[in-house]
Amino acid sequence: MKKVRLKELESRLQQVDGFEKPKLLLEQYPTRPHIAACMLYTIHNTYDDIENKVVADLGCGCGVLSIGTAMLGAGLCVGFDIDEDALEIFNRNAEEFELTNIDMVQCDVCLLSNRMSKSFDTVIMNPPFGTKNNKGTDMAFLKTALEMARTAVYSLHKSSTREHVQKKAAEWKIKIDIIAELRYDLPASYKFHKKKSVDIEVDLIRFSF
């Protein structure tokens, strides 16, 4: 198995460029390097669901999770996002790191599932939390991810929605494991944010069949 230290992975992910002008409507918050590194390190070392696997990253934004996945030896990682500007930055990032096991597709993630059913070993994502104007987006992303994955889906969800997520998983007859509880340091990206940054508690959840 490809050996990468957590600190080393985090410091490499710190070099990934983020959103230049985040779009509120798309709930664009960057996945911080610390969170991305913890998430990918756990998936790689505990479950071996990255190396030589075909991985999808839904709502990939500027590509921090995809790039980390490619660094950890994925056979191929494909990032999906609706936002052309974010994918342009993603493309620059991939070129900067000279990664060849990575690709990106511009599309509406919620319309993907029929075309991509069971096409990926693993799906990873930090979906929109479904607050503000996008209620239920997190669950729509999750439903799509579960249709695309053959083995497992790894996703970040606000800890405050844990019961709701567990209920949905039971309804869909999906196995659910909360594999880490993390503090998501949300930077003040938008004008209406009063504080410099806010800590949100999030669960890293593994969904499997």
Swiss-Prot record:
GO molecular function term, any single one: rRNA (adenine-N6-)-methyltransferase activity
Subunit structure: Heterodimer; heterodimerizes with TRMT112.
GO BP annotations, alphabetical order: positive regulation of translation; rRNA methylation; rRNA processing; stem cell differentiation
Protein name: rRNA N(6)-adenosine-methyltransferase METTL5
InterPro entries with a match to the protein in the record: DNA_methylase_N6_adenine_CS, rRNA_MeTrfase/Polyamine_Synth, SAM-dependent_MTases_sf, Small_mtfrase_dom
Main subcellular location: nucleus
Keyword S-adenosyl-L-methionine included in the entry's annotation: yes
Catalyzed reactions: adenosine(1832) in 18S rRNA + S-adenosyl-L-methionine = N(6)-methyladenosine(1832) in 18S rRNA + S-adenosyl-L-homocysteine + H(+)
Tissue distribution: Expressed from very early development (8 post-conceptual weeks) and expression persists through adulthood in multiple substructures of the brain, including the cerebellar cortex, hippocampus, and striatum.
Disease involvement: Intellectual developmental disorder, autosomal recessive 72: A form of intellectual disability, a disorder characterized by significantly below average general intellectual functioning associated with impairments in adaptive behavior and manifested during the developmental period. MRT72 patients manifest moderate to severe intellectual disability, microcephaly, and dysmorphic facial features.
Family designation: Belongs to the methyltransferase superfamily. PrmA family.
Organism domain of life: Eukaryota
Regulation: rRNA N6-adenosine-methyltransferase activity is inhibited by zinc.
PROSITE patterns: N6_MTASE
One Pfam family hit: MTS
Protein residues bound to S-adenosyl-L-methionine: Q28, T31, G59, C62, V64, D81, D108, V109
Organism: Homo sapiens
Originating gene: METTL5
Location(s) in or outside the cell: Nucleus; Presynapse; Postsynapse
Keywords from the UniProt entry: Cell projection, Intellectual disability, Methyltransferase, Nucleus, S-adenosyl-L-methionine, Synapse, Transferase
Gene Ontology CC terms, in alphabetical order: cell projection; cytosol; fibrillar center; nucleolus; nucleus; postsynapse; presynapse
Protein's job: Catalytic subunit of a heterodimer with TRMT112, which specifically methylates the 6th position of adenine in position 1832 of 18S rRNA. N6-methylation of adenine(1832) in 18S rRNA resides in the decoding center of 18S rRNA and is required for translation and embryonic stem cells (ESCs) pluripotency and differentiation.
EC number: 2.1.1.-
Organism classification: Eukaryota, Metazoa, Chordata, Craniata, Vertebrata
